[in-house]
């Protein structure tokens, strides 16, 4: 969105423009009453193709609704020379001359007033109000004119953590979480409203931790309160023995999830119906399709997930080849792909149909008997932050070891091929590039990598974190050093954190 208003807004600000804009917001954007919601559902269709979806926009100069995605509103703007339109989902004002969403103080004020009215009609409390400084705060600002500026070389947010005795597993996850963009924005905007005792609330401690990290202080922080709360709420992690960073991540997300409350004030006790910040950022939906080999009936279930655990070549689990070798041969269906293994290879294997065999027959609702079947996992809904766990630690009755297979992972990742909607592009388990691979909604950027050095019995965790777009740093407990992109991509990789490149705000 353009930071300042454009001159083309002035052409709209004539006669009763404020009242006209209010009517549009009341009837077609926020729709507070049941009557206006019915009117919106009936009236808001593209005047060219009749579609209800495709990011409908309304012309501000005349009565016209058009698709933004299919450029129908663009055609109208060009033909009629009507430069401004309003997004009917989010209320943003788009200028076709500037080719951007623009900001105008007067229009923004009207939008917020009408949104508050709509929330009140629906019995919803205001989610978040814009900060308006009090007289005392204005006085403080006048007496303290110096401001800290964020530049490309700024290191604010970088802070080491003291190792309290085999707590590198915790420190590496804390570094990844404190550099998760949306989580950082949530805590630095003081959005958490605690209804527990603050000294027992992990969310309160994380809020304080974010304040410590972004205070500008450079001395290493001592996370003793965080460690105490983790021990209190996740007893299996208590003690000074070495722990698994992945296990700590899941435990921390679980406790944070339980201590959070969603915007409607309901307890966050159901991962499928929760609006807490943890679920908003980290929860995705994993679709499991079980297909009967006799009648080909499909049974589908969707389960929430916070991370995706991926098998590696070299483990006792067969790692099927997913791309042909130099000679195109496969030995017993169990040979490894030629050359380096990639994260994409692991994801292809994860989403490949698996024959369950005669020893794992499932009762088919169509055949009404136990039949052999195939099972396939795909992504029904992607989280904002996707965490990939490379299963480097193998535990079995006969074997305990670390798998050191190098896995190549990219700076940018497109998850479109692994979506449930792209399932038809993989015929009989063979990977094909889907037609909609240019879908920006499924594209991710790498922002943190947790590594494990050493053996299963004795090791150490470190984290690479992205501070700015192309600036990487290595966090080794209290020591933070500059790192190159090559350092990051050449690392072994244990936990890989990716953030969506494009977000739609609600």
Curated annotation (Swiss-Prot):
The protein's UniProt keywords, in alphabetical order, are: Activator, Cell cycle, Chromatin regulator, Hydrolase, Metal-binding, Nucleus, Protease, Thiol protease, Transcription, Transcription regulation, Ubl conjugation pathway, Zinc, Zinc-finger
ZnF (UBP-type) intervals: 4-121
Tell me the PROSITE patterns matching this sequence.
USP_1, USP_2, USP_3, ZF_UBP
The question of whether Transcription regulation is a record keyword is answered with yes
List residues of the USP domain: 159-501
Annotated residues for binding of Zn(2+) 2: 46, 49, 67, 72
Assembly, per entry: Component of some SAGA transcription coactivator-HAT complexes.
Spell out the PANTHER family in the cross-references: UBIQUITIN CARBOXYL-TERMINAL HYDROLASE (PTHR21646), UBIQUITIN CARBOXYL-TERMINAL HYDROLASE 22 (PTHR21646:SF33)
Q: What is this protein called?
A: Ubiquitin carboxyl-terminal hydrolase 22
Q: Which organism is it from?
A: Danio rerio
What does the organism's lineage look like at the top? Eukaryota, Metazoa, Chordata, Craniata, Vertebrata
